[in-house]
């Protein structure tokens, strides 16, 4: 009777080992065909931020404790600052003695009178907030929350408003304090013209105001290098998805120059002016222009090459760790 070799365990083992060896050899041969460019992913600025994630800095922690009070702690007299006249869409407004209905405008203050349950068409009472407006008129906001939900909520957002207590807390913490500005774009105050003055210079905080719903804090500063001149920057608070311009993105508590002792003085002056030159390192360029929107890092015959891309067609090319070419 003829024996089937495929049933021989030794034969099966030999063929398995042989196929494994062929696969490994083929994989090694194929990997040698790659130049490095084909397998190099585009790294976004978000990837860079994740790599640099660490314990919160002093700047990240400085205003982190300032948060709106939960609704259960709201008392009569609580103030909200109007940021947009579209708030009239979400408010029920009464008329004054002359029969005029006033639309709240940006900068107006609404003062809470009551937070009380009111009947609805579904017979399920909801908490309605009653405010007095800047003209003494009565304004009502329907929260859509029953009393239990109202008391259990940690926060509530009234559209087109800013919590005035939060602005007061930031003002108490910042006014009169000497800081260093790291934000590049600012505006003249109170005119509001956009400017890009020098960064990493000392400033003194002179005032704090309510801003917009997206950028709720305006910090008014007097730069050391432009005394008697007021500038302003917008700032966010908290740790939500919209907190993209918090204190640590705008200010430094200490002189940033002390963190970079190896940077030459003439290069530091370029950085403060938002300029670059050939031969600067990636860190120096990042300090001057900010983080790129994306970069590609690939090996080449000349060494490691990095390409940084910014908005408006700006790009930087680094070779072996120094700036070799750029377009601004």
Predicted regions and their residues:
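Bacterial N-terminal signal peptides that target proteins for export
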Residues: 5-21
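C-terminal motif of bacterial Sec signal peptides marking the signal peptidase cleavage site
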Residues: 30-32
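Residues within mature, well-folded domains
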Residues: 34-85, 99-108, 112-328
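Short, solvent-exposed loop/turn elements at domain surfaces
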Residues: 89-92, 120
């Amino acid at each position: 009777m003829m024996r089937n070799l495929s049933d021989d365990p030794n034969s099966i083992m030999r063929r398995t080992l042989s196929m494994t060896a062929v696969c490994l050899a083929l994989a090694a041969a194929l990997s040698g065909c790659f130049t490095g460019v084909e397998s190099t992913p585009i790294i976004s600025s978000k990837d860079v931020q994740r790599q640099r994630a660490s314990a919160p800095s002093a700047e990240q922690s400085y205003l982190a404790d300032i948060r709106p009070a939960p609704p259960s702690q709201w008392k009569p007299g609580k103030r909200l600052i109007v940021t947009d006249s579209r708030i009239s869409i979400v408010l029920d407004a009464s008329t004054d003695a002359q029969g005029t209905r006033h639309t709240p405008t940006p900068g107006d203050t609404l003062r809470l009178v009551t937070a009380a349950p009111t009947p609805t068409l579904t017979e399920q009472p909801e908490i309605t907030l009653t405010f007095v407006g800047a003209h003494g008129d009565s304004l009502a906001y329907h929260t859509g929350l029953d009393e239990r939900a109202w008391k259990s909520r940690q926060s509530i957002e009234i559209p087109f408003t800013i919590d005035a207590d939060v602005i007061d807390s930031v003002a108490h913490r910042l006014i009169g304090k000497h800081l260093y500005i790291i934000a590049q774009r600012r505006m003249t105050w109170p005119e509001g013209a956009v400017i890009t003055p020098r960064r990493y210079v000392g400033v003194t905080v002179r005032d704090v105001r309510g801003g917009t719903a997206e950028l709720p804090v305006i910090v008014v500063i007097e730069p050391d290098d432009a005394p008697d001149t007021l500038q302003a920057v917008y700032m966010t608070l908290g740790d939500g998805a919209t907190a993209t311009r918090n204190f640590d993105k705008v200010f430094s508590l200490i002189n940033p120059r002390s963190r970079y002792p190896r940077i030459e003085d003439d290069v530091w002056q370029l950085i403060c002016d938002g300029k670059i030159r050939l031969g600067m390192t990636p860190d120096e360029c990042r300090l001057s222009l900010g983080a790129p929107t994306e970069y590609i890092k690939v090996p080449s015959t000349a060494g490691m090459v990095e390409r940084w891309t910014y908005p408006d067609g700006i790009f930087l090319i680094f070779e072996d760790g120094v700036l070799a070419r750029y377009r601004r």
